[in-house]
Design a protein with these regions (language model features):
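Short, conserved micro-motifs composed of acidic
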Residues: 1-177
Length: 177
């Protein structure tokens, strides 16, 4: 999907297909935003469908020019948005966070999913199934090498179940996500 001639990454859609959350490069004054290590920063956006066009493209309020917010995933009830970020409060290089989506379309305060999921390394690319299982990539949990795909059950009380490496053939000695 291209909006404003800028490519979108990792789109996730509401069940009715009328709202899309997606990742974009962080452009600052017409240039790609970068951190002090020259890494391109990312931001999350929301767009709504009007007929056959995507409109009302808005930047999510917890984005920043100082860190990345990327890779959105929706909970089955569409009331929680999961994402990866290196925002303040991150335990490692990047962590999985969640934020509530309020009935009026506003957002709560992003919450780090904690040290059962997040490590001192990278956790990224969350995906939530209809059964409330969270799949994510990590190179901080024991794996086969590089980023591996892991799964855990998201519980109604906000806790998570045990973390399981999904194993081969999904995971390899290379980065898998």
């Amino acid at each position: 999907v291209k909006l404003d001639k800028i490519p979108t990454l990792n789109p996730v859609f509401t069940k009715d297909g009328n709202t899309m959350y997606f990742t974009r490069n962080n452009f600052n004054n017409g240039k790609k935003g970068r951190d002090s290590e020259r890494t391109i920063l990312l931001k999350l956006y929301k767009a709504t469908k009007d007929g056959d066009k995507w409109t009302n493209v808005t930047e999510l309020p917890f984005n920043s020019n100082e860190y990345s917010v990327a890779h959105p995933a929706l909970s089955p009830d569409e009331k929680t948005l999961y994402f990866a970020s290196n925002m303040p409060g991150t335990l490692g290089a990047s962590d999985i966070f969640k934020v509530s989506i309020n009935a009026d379309g506003s957002y709560g305060t992003p919450e780090n999913l904690g040290n059962k999921i997040n490590t001192e390394a990278r956790e990224t690319f969350p995906f939530v199934t209809d059964n409330n299982e969270l799949y994510f990539a990590s190179d901080g949990h024991p794996g086969l090498g590089g980023l591996d795909v892991f799964v855990t059950q998201l519980k109604e009380d906000g806790n998570v179940g045990s973390i399981k490496n999904v194993g081969e053939p999904v995971n390899s000695k290379m980065d898998d996500f």
